[in-house]
Amino acid sequence: EMSASLVGSEMCIRDRFLDKGFALAKTTEIAKQAGVTHAMLHYYYRTKEKLFERVFQEKVDLMAHSLVATLDDGKPFLKQMEDLTGAHFDFIAENPKLPFFLLNEIHLNEKRRELYLPVLSSAVRNTLQNVERRLEQAVKRGEVRPIRTADLMFSIFSLNVMSFVGQSLVQQAFDLDREDMRQFILQRRAENIEMIFSRLRK
């Protein structure tokens, strides 16, 4: 059974991978930051690849669950999309380093792309399927305008991701302090939802 000290240190382990990426994250540094011995880390995870796999799978599962959990047939479709867009935005706000992590580890690294893209694709596909059925029904009921599910979800993902990827540029270009930036991000959440609504409303 995994020791309590290691379980309690897993957030440190995740942060190290998100900060450094796979190639630059050293298991000795991970163990030191997590407050465990290198031998203990190796005993529970065997290899850096296994540790990375655990971190990646956990983040993908968490994101997928947070999105699917917003879908409820008892709510109007627009409300479901408001909740889904907001949940995705909040997930990135809680994991702001994740977009860069995915870019580095999947888009720029062919080996890890082959290993982990299917995991990410499976989670995205599951969300798409859940949204697609509800979207088709909403269009038939005349609630929303027709749109391909892939286009809708890509718009949601790209709007939300760019709100965080572009933070440094926005902060410098508009000379925003920390509080201004916090307010800007809060406003982006509402703006992103409104932009999705503007495409769906009849």
For every predicted segment, state its role.
Residues 11-12:
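Active-site loops and adjacent core secondary-structure elements that bind or stabilize anionic groups
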